[in-house]
Amino acid sequence: MMLLCACENYLDLTPKGATLLDNLTEIEYLLNGNYTNSAYEFEDLYVMTNDSYGKMANPSTVLANNIGLEYALMAYDESVDRYVYTNSNPHYSGYYSNINSMNILLARLDDLSGDIALKASLAAEAKILRAYWHYLLVNIFAAQYDAATADAQGGIPYVTDMDLEKVNEKLTLAEVYRLLLEDCSEKTINNLPDKAVNILRPGKAMGYALRAKIHLQMKNYILQQFLFEFC
């Protein structure tokens, strides 16, 4: 009997340095990005805004090859199916890893005790960050939004749960952008802190800025201009 009790005591111990995500303090850590993750290497994406060529090869070489994701981004070639390059791109897996962290937070939050306002704020931050990573994914690995073709154009999977066994189907562009706006709803933004907790976390300014960027991609220019005034 004494041996049994001793075993139970050892089983109840939490390993040093580990977290069970069983309280608000611990689960809040999921909102802080890991900058060693390849998902945060944005250099190659600067070409999309004509800022720089990042770590890419010589522009003449990339454009001459006429294939690959780097070529598609640099040449703004909409005829390239960017989705076929997802398996070999570290951004793709890295972004979905970050999305999974947000989904874990959202799935666990309701079961935790604590301040209701804080829980609402954490949920809002997770939804905004989830939308942010999906926004990057759809702009890198799918065609640009066109209202005339969005219902038929392939987009990306939009993952809103942490079921790792489920195969997430690729949605249409229209469905992806609908979910982006759903995650960036006015209710969600209102629950964000007026000022971000730290530079890794979203506040109201980021919420409005992201929603404005989504409307900009959708060519809803009046709404985009209105939202940018809140940033």
Regions from the language model: what does each represent?
Residues 99-102, 177, 184-185, 228:
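Inward-facing hydrophobic residues that define packing positions of alpha-helical scaffold repeats
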Residues 7-54:
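Membrane-proximal, proline-rich intrinsically disordered regions
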Residues 141-178:
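Short coil/linker segments at helix-helix boundaries
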